[in-house]
Amino acid sequence: MKRVIILMMDSFGIGGAADAAKFGDEGANTLASVAKLNNGLKIPNLISLGLVKAAEASAGVKIETGPQPPAQVNIPSKYGFMREQSHGKDTLSGHWEMAGVPVLFDWGYFKPGYPSFPKELIEQICKEAGIDKILGNKAASGTEILEELGEEHIKTGKPICYTSADSVFQIAAHEKHFGLERLYTICEIAFKYLKPYKIARVIARPFEGERKGEFKRTKNRHDYAVKPPAPTVLDFLKENGGNVISIGKINDIYAKQGITKAVKASGLEELWNTTIEETKNASGNSIIFTNFVDFDMVWGHRRDFKGYAGGLEYFDSRLPELANILQEGDLVFITADHGCDPSYKGTDHTRENVPAIMFGKNVKNGFIGGRETYSDLGQTVAEYLGITKLNNGTSFL
């Protein structure tokens, strides 16, 4: 019975991208920065699986993790790093590429300064949604714009619309005063009118709180993403009668394509609990695919290196629990979709290589080197599960 578990650590880059300078990200290294700024990291299980060796090979710098307690995961692993072929450093590009479909075209983007959005676009959205005007209309940090405009939003009922360095149109609205379903409806309207602009995602950002200093996002975020331009490894497994269990953001990221069961979860603990539970219950010929979004959304973008370190140490502490329930035919992958170095300027993603770690009871230990595309992971999954060979990537099985 063969199963694949993919642990996607959103934004967990390990530096060394050859084209980082092109993105203004020269020297960015999420893991190295978090380790250095916290004077070490207690991640013995990730280290035993080859993370630090992979990271040092990726960027050519020493990762200062410091003394470690004994590892509790004792299982064979292959480790290395993957370079991104896709033109962007965004969530969709990274996820699609690791599933065999690199994004070899350019997304549309909005200018950062006010007004970010074309007048006719906003008029179309407002008219169909039955609203007068919007707030924001610029590139901004999601938490900062709530502090700036949250009270005005509650007072006026105008949704807060903003963008970032990614190909996104984000709409923040109060879950109680504005209404969650109303927010989702406006996002669906915006998604329809954004198609000509080649924008990758519309993101609903519900929040709560009554005044400045109290506003915080809720767990009811929803992403409206365009569909991958070609079938992914998830589609091929589904077509072959297999199971694809998405946990967290995965269902939204792939626009529900190739998913047979979508499980909602948020927060590192709940995402881990759900992953463990689904691994216990999943049948053979399955992919269990979890996006651990907090590394990106809660710590990376907010440049919170202490929070990032705490998240890594917690993630590491749950690995033995997963390893202990693995069956003979299980393969686990640990990877990421891009970087988000919390020591770096700005608040955006950083172009970095990502880990490629594979472990399981029947894996042969070894270094797989630097892979030329994230699609090598998808090709490895396809070969292991005996499904259609992908058009991109080389297996490291």
Curated annotation (Swiss-Prot):
Its main location: cytoplasm. Mn(2+) 1 binds at D10, D337, H338. This is Phosphopentomutase. It catalyses: 2-deoxy-alpha-D-ribose 1-phosphate = 2-deoxy-D-ribose 5-phosphate; alpha-D-ribose 1-phosphate = D-ribose 5-phosphate. It comes from Elusimicrobium minutum (strain Pei191). Isomerase that catalyzes the conversion of deoxy-ribose 1-phosphate (dRib-1-P) and ribose 1-phosphate (Rib-1-P) to deoxy-ribose 5-phosphate (dRib-5-P) and ribose 5-phosphate (Rib-5-P), respectively. The gene is deoB. Its EC number is 5.4.2.7. It is an enzyme of class 5 (isomerase).
